[in-house]
Each structure stands twice: as structure tokens, then as C-alpha cells.
């Protein structure tokens, strides 16, 4: 989001009345690919198409606060993959993560992931690093 949008968001969180009333939406992979005219799989596997889809959203709706901004995650698979979850992908379907544990009593067996090495986390971090200059150039 832009610096102005960030300041607006903080003001709202602080309980201030902001005029005009701001509008915000979650920007994420369930709607961006189809809205941008690309497959869901292309959105996840092409950094260029990912960036262009997010850029199209912020340029089409410049007054909307999009959270978290440029959505870099791979559906709802990023975090589970870091804990060892197998993920399944379809061309125009949302990816899904398979169970790692089958009982809450097993939660202590999970190993804390390393974002630089585990699952899809390195891809998310690297995508944002690779596009940081372009995102900033777009004012975000």
C-alpha cells in the first residue's frame, strides 16, 4: 500500500474518524488470476504474471487499500508447506495443503520452519525481493 494508505489505516486503527471513509479489501489469489485473465497456475508460477495482476488491481482501484498489498503467497499452501505439508495444484483451482498431523496431540512434533529454506517460504521471500524495486516504483 502507499504511504498515504498506510497512514489512513493506522488512523482508522487508532479509532479516528477518517473522511472520506476508506475502503479496503484483501488482495489475494482467489480472485486475482481470473479477474486478470490468466490461469491460477500461471499466477503462481510466473512472477511476471503475478506482478502484472497485482499491479492491475492497484491501478484499477487506486483509492482502495489492499491488504496486504502485493499478495506473494502461494494460496493457502505457503505456511503449511514449511511444516512439510504436501500441496496439490490445479490449473484453475486453488492449491490445497494436505494434513501434516492428524491429532492436536501431535502439534509438539512439528519443527519450527526456517523461512530461508523450508517449503514455499523461500519462493515468497525471493519473489518479494526480486520485485521490491518495481513495487516501490508503483508507489507501494
Please give the residue ranges for each predicted region.
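Catalytic cores of TIM-barrel enzymes
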Residues: 1-140
